[in-house]
Amino acid sequence: MKKSISALFIATALIFSATTVFAASGSSIFGSEGCIACHTINGLGGSVGPDLSHVGSKRSLSWLKTQITNPDANFAAGSTVTIDGKSYMAIMPGHKHMAASKLNTLAAYLESLK
């Protein structure tokens, strides 16, 4: 019984640690790739683009990956996009050459924002 509880405690701690590292990695990429210059998360960042604080409750992982690498696939460049009642110009640069590992981490981080 004690071994089971210890194993459960260790597994929970590892999951919590991995989640914390994952969130920190995604947040770091969000900053280093310049996303924060235009987008807000929890009150921090720019206001040129939509607030992404809860983007994970609205968009799928696949949609987010497409939006990051090829924003014109979802919104025509130069068009006006209305999200949550606020209008934005579709001017986001694509990150077609972002390494797959970075893209996956960033998109998963954004999807986790619920």
Regions found by a protein language model. Name each.
Residues 30-33, 87:
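Disulfide-bonded cysteine motifs in exported proteins
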Residues 46-55, 71-105, 113:
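Axial heme c-ligation environment in periplasmic c-type cytochrome domains
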Residues 1-24, 67, 74, 98, ...:
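Post-cleavage N-terminal segment of exported redox proteins
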Residues 13-31, 50, 60-63:
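Electrostatic cytochrome c docking/interface patches
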Residues 33-41, 64, 106, 110:
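The canonical Cys-X-X-Cys-His
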Residues 38-45, 57, 69:
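Detector for the c-type heme attachment site
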